[in-house]
Amino acid sequence: VPASDQLTVHVLPARHFSGRGLKRNQTLWASFLFVTPQQKIYYSGDSGYGPHFKAIGDEFGPVDLAIMENGQYDQDWKYIHMMPDETAQAADDLRARAVLPGHAGRSFWRNTAGMNRINGWRLPAKEGPGVC
């Protein structure tokens, strides 16, 4: 979607469900890529890990900054939220040059309360993305 001659917004896949409104799965769940002439910024939104990250990286990567979900995780939610190692792998799949963790320290759901989201991060490789 061209937002202006200086900004294009790509609406891309994410893996989650939609729970807004009276019925589930009646609205779209997505991630976004913001492209300017100078850089590409990816926002994962809530998403479980999946092959969509590699597909996005293959089509649009590398991205300059990936703002990645990292805070509502629990093994029971693995299809809709990522564990820290999956977040790092997704950033690697996107070929992100830098990563900004989202949701860090924001959880109030059952098993995630009090978990330190940043300590679970592992960067995929020495030349992999930096954490902002």
Curated annotation (Swiss-Prot):
Pfam families: Lactamase_B_2. SUPFAM superfamilies: Metallo-hydrolase/oxidoreductase. It comes from the Bacteria. It is found in: Cell outer membrane. Signal peptide: none annotated. Keywords: Cell outer membrane, Membrane. Coiled coil: none annotated. The keyword DNA damage does not apply. To M.tuberculosis Rv0906. This is Outer membrane protein RomA. The lineage of its organism: Bacteria, Pseudomonadati, Pseudomonadota, Gammaproteobacteria, Enterobacterales.
